[in-house]
């Protein structure tokens, strides 16, 4: 009876444990799959001398290899599981000494006989475990997946409660292990499946300690307890491989009321063998003081100094609070107030090489386009100029053809007959009107006045003079004298040395051309009293004039007899240089004769007179010049003046050994055709006017139309001996009037003012105004 009761108790206890035992743990797959079925919790007994037993490893996958399957730890694998098991409501799992457990189980297997019914139930239980093992092997992850140790921690409510229940736990543990001891005794009689190699067992020994304990009903009301099962590999090589590069997966499984389990996977540790971030990527994220990443908020946020270098705010603040108040990178002086917080997460240097290359290409293309547009505009302007010149030349050819037909038979071959006819063509002034003195202007108290000219557009007389404040503003300029109210105006500074030539443009209002001994030619606007253009001739300039056929060109006579031609559109230098044909003497006078002004002389050009001779530079097509040397007496020339309407010129000679007095010779310009059909320009004397016996100054004369507009010509010359200006009738050669002055007359200028004809004479200090009445 006692034996049957024992068999019944064993069978009933085993069936009860199989039927009512809750699933102790849930295997959480590291790959995120569904949890597999788990075997019942069993006690694994490690024996050093016995062969390895069939052991179901809780929450551990097995290796999927060809051949019979074994419930044993996989080679070179470390499986970590967390289990929280409730055995019959009050059982607890606790790590105990494996030696004590072995001593407690050995008497149980030896002294207690196992009934046949218990063996049948054990066999069915083993077959179920084998089927479960096959399922676990199917769900096991690959063998190359490294899994680290997993710890399930259990926290006891109090240390005193464990000490009180030690005795009862050992008793209950002995009773609860009786069926399991019978199971392991029977399993020794079963045929063993081939196990893995001894080498794998040596490399991966598994030591598991399990102790089942129960407590009284009063302990069930205490706080929740957490269990910790630590599965660690004892092999040194496994530990080394785990420390070098294995990824440790730590899983915690917590039992929730009702038998449900919630997986909780801890974050994986960083693998040190992964490729690190390159230094180039970290340059924009790292503080150069602490070599840590700066942040976009907090104490270590991105900051910059005035020099532009970047640091963490906390680091650079500490740095500047120390003794070295300089930038850590460039050693520039800095202070705490120079710190500027930058609202940027990271910094990256943008590669703009392609952009800069495209930008330079764009600038080059724009420059080429502007250059092409400028060339196109210049070509259009040249086309317009050539078109106008072509039309002018066409009209000129027609006029010349008409004049040639009309005057071909009238050209005389005898100079004497031509002179007689020229004298007869100049009518004499028969009326009794003459010039009356009106006013005197003191230009310069210190003297040194030299030349004057008149501007019709501004109704003013312009006189050259030295600076009135030579100590503050040295040099020479002009003074404007208004002919409307007969009052002097302001002084306009222009040159550094004495002015030798003045001329107004007939097309530009108030634009004055001046030549000076300071080797410059200047254009001055008298409307704004400013110099608008300066040309450096390189040598002292003695005379100047405007081109009446081409308003954009001017002439400048140099001290060596050369003539420089300037284009106002070219502000750099002259465009032509006309070299003298004979002696290199200063050009004392330049006068321009326009084209087709007279039937007797239709050619245009500039008349240049030096101290030795005179030349006429004919203006050809393409703005080229052809020289014609005029037949004149050699030496002694002091002035050349022209009258454009009648083509007459006035030449003044000094007294010489053949002539005792000053002479002013009126000449007529003429031409004849050579064998090649080219014109040869010349001049012949018409009338001679005599003056005083002295001529020390380079005085200027004047030739102009009679104010009566009767076609007669008047000539006015200066006489140094009498300090006066002599007025002559060009037709009769008679002296009409003598205009007295206090000093020798240096220049003479006729002009029209207030519907009256006036004449101005210039001495070294004053200007005398005479009116025709």
UniProtKB/Swiss-Prot annotation:
This is E3 ubiquitin-protein ligase RFWD3. Pathway: Protein modification; protein ubiquitination. The keyword Protein biosynthesis does not apply. Residues 361-403 form a coiled coil. Its main location: nucleus. The modification Phosphoserine is found at residues 47, 64. It comes from the Eukaryota. Residues 18-67, 92-117, 139-230, 259-279 are annotated as: Disordered. Residues 50-59, 207-221 have a biased composition (Low complexity). Gene3D superfamilies: YVTN repeat-like/Quinoprotein amine dehydrogenase (2.130.10.10), Zinc/RING finger domain, C3HC4 (zinc finger) (3.30.40.10). It is an enzyme of class 2 (transferase). One of its GO terms (molecular function) is zinc ion binding. The keyword DNA-binding does not apply.
């Amino acid at each position: 009876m006692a034996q049957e009761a024992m068999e019944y108790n064993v069978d009933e206890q085993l069936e009860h444990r199989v039927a009512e035992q809750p699933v102790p743990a849930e295997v959480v797959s590291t790959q995120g799959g569904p949890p597999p079925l788990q075997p019942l919790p069993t006690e694994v007994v490690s024996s050093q001398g016995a062969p390895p037993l069939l052991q179901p490893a809780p929450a551990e996958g097995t290796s999927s290899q060809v051949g019979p399957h074994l419930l044993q730890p996989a080679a070179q694998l470390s499986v970590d599981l967390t289990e929280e098991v409730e055995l019959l409501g009050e059982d607890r799992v606790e790590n105990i000494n494996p030696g004590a457990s072995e001593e407690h189980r050995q008497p149980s297997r030896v002294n207690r006989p196992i009934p046949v019914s218990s063996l049948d139930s054990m066999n069915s239980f083993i077959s179920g475990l084998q089927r479960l093992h096959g399922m676990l092997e199917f769900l096991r992850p690959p063998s190359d997946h490294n899994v680290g140790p997993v710890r399930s921690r259990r926290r006891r409510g109090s240390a005193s409660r464990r000490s009180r229940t030690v005795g009862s736990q050992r008793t209950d543990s002995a009773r609860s292990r009786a069926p399991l001891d019978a199971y392991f005794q029977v399993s020794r009689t079963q045929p063993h499946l081939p196990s893995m190699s001894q080498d794998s067992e040596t490399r991966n020994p598994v030591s598991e300690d399990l102790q089942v304990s129960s407590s009284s009903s009063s302990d069930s009301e205490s706080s929740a307890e957490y269990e910790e099962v630590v599965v660690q590999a004892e092999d040194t090589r496994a530990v080394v491989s785990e420390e070098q590069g294995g990824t440790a997966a730590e899983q915690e499984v917590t039992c929730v009321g009702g038998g449900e389990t919630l997986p909780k996977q801890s974050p994986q540790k960083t693998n040190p063998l992964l490729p690190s971030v390159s230094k180039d990527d970290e340059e924009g994220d790292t503080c150069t003081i602490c070599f840590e990443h700066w942040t976009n908020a907090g104490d270590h946020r991105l900051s910059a100094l005035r020099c532009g270098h970047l640091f963490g705010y906390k680091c650079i603040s500490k740095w500047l609070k120390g003794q070295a108040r300089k930038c850590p990178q460039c050693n520039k002086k800095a202070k705490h107030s120079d710190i500027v917080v930058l609202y940027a997460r990271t910094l990256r240097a943008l590669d703009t090489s392609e952009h800069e290359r495209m930008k330079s290409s764009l600038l080059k293309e724009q420059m080429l386009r502007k250059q092409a547009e400028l060339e196109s505009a210049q070509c259009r302007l040249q086309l317009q100029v050539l078109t106008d010149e072509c039309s002018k030349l066409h009209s000129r050819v027609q006029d010349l053809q008409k004049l040639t037909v009309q005057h071909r038979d009238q050209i005389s071959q005898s100079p004497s007959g031509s002179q007689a006819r020229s004298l007869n063509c100049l009518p004499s002034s028969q009326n009794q009107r003459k010039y009356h003195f009106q006013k005197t202007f003191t230009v310069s108290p210190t003297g040194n006045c030299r030349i004057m000219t008149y501007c019709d557009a501004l109704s003013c007389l312009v006189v050259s003079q030295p600076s009135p404040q030579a100590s503050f503003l040295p040099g020479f300029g002009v003074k404007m004298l208004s002919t409307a109210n007969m009052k002097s105006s302001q002084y306009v500074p222009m040159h550094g040395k004495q002015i030798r030539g003045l001329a107004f443009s007939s097309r530009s209002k108030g634009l004055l051309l001046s030549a000076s001994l300071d080797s410059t030619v200047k254009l001055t606007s008298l409307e704004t009293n400013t110099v608008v253009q300066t040309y450096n001739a390189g040598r002292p300039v003695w005379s100047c004039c405007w081109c009446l056929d081409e308003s954009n060109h001017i002439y400048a006579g140099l001290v060596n007899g050369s003539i420089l031609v300037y284009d106002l559109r070219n502000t750099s230098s002259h465009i032509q240089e006309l070299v003298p044909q004979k002696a290199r003497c200063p050009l004392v006078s330049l006068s321009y004769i326009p084209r087709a002004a007279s039937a007797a002389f239709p050619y245009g050009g500039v008349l240049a007179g030096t101290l030795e001779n005179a030349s006429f530079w004919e203006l050809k097509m393409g703005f080229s010049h052809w020289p014609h040397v005029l037949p004149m007496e050699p030496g002694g020339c002091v002035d050349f003046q022209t009258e454009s309407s009648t083509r007459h010129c006035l030449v003044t000679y000094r007294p010489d050994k053949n002539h005792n007095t000053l002479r002013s010779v009126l000449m007529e310009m003429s031409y004849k055709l050579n064998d090649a059909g080219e014109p040869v320009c010349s001049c012949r004397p018409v009338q001679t006017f005599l003056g005083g016996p002295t001529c020390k100054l380079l005085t200027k004369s004047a030739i102009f139309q009679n104010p009566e507009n009767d076609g007669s010509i008047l000539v006015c010359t200066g006489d140094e001996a009498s300090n006066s200006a002599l007025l002559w009738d060009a037709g009769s050669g008679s002296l009409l009037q003598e205009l007295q002055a206090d000093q020798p007359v240096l220049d003479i200028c006729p002009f029209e003012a207030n519907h009256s004809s006036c004449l101005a004479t210039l001495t070294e200090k004053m200007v005398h105004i005479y009116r025709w009445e």
